[in-house]
Design a protein with these regions (language model features):
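Solvent-exposed beta-strand/loop surfaces of large extracellular or lumenal domains
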Residues: 1-8, 64-78
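Short, solvent-exposed coil/turn linker segments
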Residues: 10-11, 122
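Aromatic, loop-rich ligand-recognition surfaces of beta-strand-rich domains
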Residues: 52, 60-63, 76-127, 135-138, ...
Length: 210
C-alpha cells in the first residue's frame, strides 16, 4: 500500500523501443489498471485503506409490507438495556430500525447488541454477519456496523452525520433462532451520544429485500 508496491514502478531502461507487453500478476488489483510515464518514481505516497462498509451501491432496504416484530423506546442513559418480546419470534435475520435519538441529532450509535434466545440468554455471536447497514461513519473513524458484536464496549457503530432517520442494521444470526428479545448498549461516553430513542424490530427467516 505504499510507494512502488502500489504503483508497480518499472524503470524505463527495462523497456525496449517500440511496443512492449507488461504482465502484472496481482491478487487484489486496482479498480482500473493504467500505465503512465513518470520522471521520478513514487516512493513515499501512502494509500490508506478505508474500512469496508456493509451497503453495496444501489442497495436500499425495503421494509414496506414486512411484519413488525416489536416496537418501543429505550430510556436515556448509559448502560445495558434489555427488551423482552410479548411473544417469541422465530427467524434468522434480525433488523433493528432506529427512528429517533435522545440528543435530537440524526446520528444513531450502538456499542454492543445481544439477541436473546428462547431461554432468555444471549445467543452465540460467533456466526453473526452484518448483511446491511444504511450508514456507517468511516471518514472520522472506524465506526462500521460489525463493531456491535466485537466484544469491545469502547468501540461502536455510528451512522454518518448527514444521514437522516430512519437508520437500519441487519444481522444474519447464522441459523434460525427462537428470539425472545434483545439487549442494547449505547456508547459509553457521557450523555451516550447517538443513543437510540424510538425503534422497530423486524425478524425474518429469509433475508430482507435490498
Amino acid at each position: 500500500e505504499i510507494g512502488p508496491q502500489q504503483t508497480l514502478f518499472m524503470p524505463g531502461c527495462w523497456l525496449k523501443e517500440g511496443e512492449n507487453e507488461i504482465l502484472v500478476l496481482d491478487l487484489k488489483g486496482p479498480a482500473k489498471a493504467s500505465i503512465k510515464g513518470l520522471k521520478k518514481p513514487i516512493l513515499d505516497m501512502l494509500r490508506e485503506k478505508a474500512p469496508e462498509t456493509h451497503r453495496k451501491d444501489g442497495e436500499k432496504l425495503k421494509l414496506t409490507g414486512e411484519k413488525l416484530g416489536h416496537e418501543g423506546a429505550f430510556t436515556p442513559g448509559n448502560g445495558w438495556q434489555e427488551v423482552r418480546f410479548a411473544t417469541p419470534v422465530k427467524g434468522r435475520y434480525f433488523c433493528l430500525e432506529s427512528l429517533s435519538s435522545f440528543d435530537g441529532k440524526q446520528v444513531s450509535a450502538i456499542a454492543e447488541l445481544d439477541v436473546l434466545g428462547s431461554d432468555g440468554k444471549p445467543i452465540s455471536r460467533d456466526a453473526w454477519k452484518i448483511i446491511y447497514a444504511d450508514s456507517e461513519e468511516t471518514n472520522n473513524g472506524n465506526y462500521t456496523a460489525d463493531k456491535i458484536f466485537d466484544l469491545q464496549e469502547s468501540t461502536f457503530w455510528s451512522t454518518v452525520n448527514k444521514a437522516t432517520f430512519p437508520h437500519q442494521i441487519i444481522i444474519d444470526l447464522g441459523e434460525k433462532q427462537t428470539i425472545s428479545g434483545f439487549k442494547y448498549l449505547p456508547r459509553a461516553e457521557k450523555g451516550a451520544p447517538g443513543q437510540i430513542k424510538e425503534y422497530r424490530v423486524y425478524i425474518k427467516t429469509d433475508n430482507f429485500s435490498l
